[in-house]
């Protein structure tokens, strides 16, 4: 069963989570998930910059 928090406890928990620095492992996991999208965007930018008329 869920516990009920007072407003002060809820604010304190929220501030604790908000100020938590992101870990390098978390950033690596994020980049791993978005790897395909970054690859495609990189290829598109390369084509745009290298196209000559």
Curated annotation (Swiss-Prot):
Residues 1-28 are annotated as: Disordered. It comes from the Eukaryota. Keywords: Cell membrane, Developmental protein, Membrane, Transmembrane, Transmembrane helix. The keyword Transmembrane applies. Residues 1-16 have a biased composition (Basic and acidic residues). It is found in: Cell membrane. InterPro entries: DVL. GO terms for cellular component: plasma membrane. It is a single-pass membrane protein. Residues 22-53 are annotated as: Required for DVL/RTFL small polypeptide activity. The chain crosses the membrane at residues 30-46. GO terms for biological process: negative regulation of cell population proliferation; shoot system development. It holds the Pfam family DVL. Small polypeptide acting as a regulatory molecule which coordinates cellular responses required for differentiation, growth and development, probably by restricting polar cell proliferation in lateral organs and coordinating socket cell recruitment and differentiation at trichome sites. Belongs to the DVL/RTFL small polypeptides family. This is Small polypeptide DEVIL 7. It comes from Arabidopsis thaliana (Mouse-ear cress). The gene is DVL7.
């Amino acid at each position: 069963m869920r516990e009920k928090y007072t407003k002060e406890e809820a604010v304190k928990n929220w501030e604790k989570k908000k100020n938590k620095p992101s870990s390098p492992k978390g950033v690596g996991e994020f980049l791993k998930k978005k790897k395909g999208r970054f690859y495609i965007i990189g290829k598109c930018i390369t084509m745009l910059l290298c196209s000559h008329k």
